[in-house]
Amino acid sequence: MTEQAARSAVIHTPFIELDKLLKRENLAATGGEAGLLIAADLIQVNGEIERRKRRKLYPGDRVVTDKDRLMVVAEQHQR
């Protein structure tokens, strides 16, 4: 099986909390479900299991689930 490329998760603020990102990107239906996924050690951030649901994610962070791979990126402003 080949490794899939990470898709971009654009944020419009300096950071986003992990549980909110999982909900926003439709990897969890609710905050409760996001918390369960995190508590079950099913989420990795930057290659390590993450157990903090409110972990702050910044541009450049990578999130991996069994369903998807995400790269957190900052919104690009047009000049």
Question: For the regions a protein language model found, what residue spans apply to each?
Answer:
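A detector for short, charged/polar N-terminal pre-domain segments
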Residues: 2-16
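A basic, amphipathic helix-loop patch mediating RNA/tRNA/ribosome contacts
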Residues: 13-59
